[in-house]
């Protein structure tokens, strides 16, 4: 087959339609968004909530968001940079931290709706799939997973946040195919492997491996862990304490900001008319006083 170079004609450029700016920036998948926010026409003024998870280089953002004509409304949010308040000071962007962030958001939104006692979720994370069961009084809080434009591969951190929200008591439609530990061959989830990821076992295993093979790399790669005194054997207990602390008090903590410093003023303050007038009178008095002293000296001579 002969290779034919595709030429873009005038008709192509005439009919070319530029995509939305946020799609060009790689921020919003409008094809997925329109399917996530479309509400049934017989549900009047009923918001459709999304469980939004986004990752930055140093943080994890989890939000419960509903769409409106005026714009998206954030009902509740949780961030990985809040986890140091619960005892997790290192590794704020891995799979285990994503689980903690999802758990924090779930407990926070249920506490806000006064449903935290009714829907406790899965208190002990075993790695097995969990779905909340509705009670007789109130239905569980339902949200749809919004992953944005990331690649939904098996074991992605976004599914760690999903697992945390599920164990926290939220009702999110899902499948266990993308959790860490799912085997493609036998199409089953290995709960032990998934539990290992939830409690940071993959991190502790790598720390042990580096400690045996490359101690120098361990000092540089896990310098923050070593500085904080976090050892490979204590990581699982650390995450268990963090989960318990999140369930005990998921409310957001108010940060106390220091008072602004009083900077030294280098430019002269603008004087009012009365201040200028008084200053002039003082200068005249000072000059008159100096002139009177000179006259006295002349008389003495």
UniProtKB/Swiss-Prot annotation:
Record keywords: Cytoplasm, Developmental protein, Nucleus, Ribonucleoprotein, Ribosomal protein, RNA-binding, rRNA-binding
Protein origin, superkingdom: Eukaryota
Listed GO MF terms: 5S rRNA binding; mRNA binding; structural constituent of ribosome
Subunit structure: Component of the large ribosomal subunit (LSU).
Annotated disulfide bonds: none
Compartments where found: Cytoplasm; Nucleus; Nucleus, Nucleolus; Nucleus, Nucleoplasm
Gene Ontology BP term (one): translation
Protein's name in the database: Large ribosomal subunit protein uL18z
Task of the protein: Component of the ribosome, a large ribonucleoprotein complex responsible for the synthesis of proteins in the cell. The small ribosomal subunit (SSU) binds messenger RNAs (mRNAs) and translates the encoded message by selecting cognate aminoacyl-transfer RNA (tRNA) molecules. The large subunit (LSU) contains the ribosomal catalytic site termed the peptidyl transferase center (PTC), which catalyzes the formation of peptide bonds, thereby polymerizing the amino acids delivered by tRNAs into a polypeptide chain.
Species of the source: Arabidopsis thaliana
GO cellular component, one term: cytoplasm
Phenotype of gene-disrupted mutants: Moderate reduction in cell number. Slightly pointed leaves and prominent marginal serrations. Delayed leaf growth and abnormal leaf patterning, with the abaxial mesophyll features appearing in the adaxial mesophyll domain. More proximal vein branching in the petiole and reduced number of small veins at later leaf developmental stages. Abnormal inflorescences terminating early and producing several secondary inflorescences. Double mutant ae6-1 as2-101 exhibits an increased number of lotus- and needle-like leaves, rough adaxial surface of expanded leaves.
Tissue-level expression: Expressed in seedlings, roots, stems, leaves, inflorescences and siliques.
UniProt family annotation: Belongs to the universal ribosomal protein uL18 family.
InterPro entries (alphabetical): Rbsml_uL18_euk, Ribosomal_uL18_C_euk
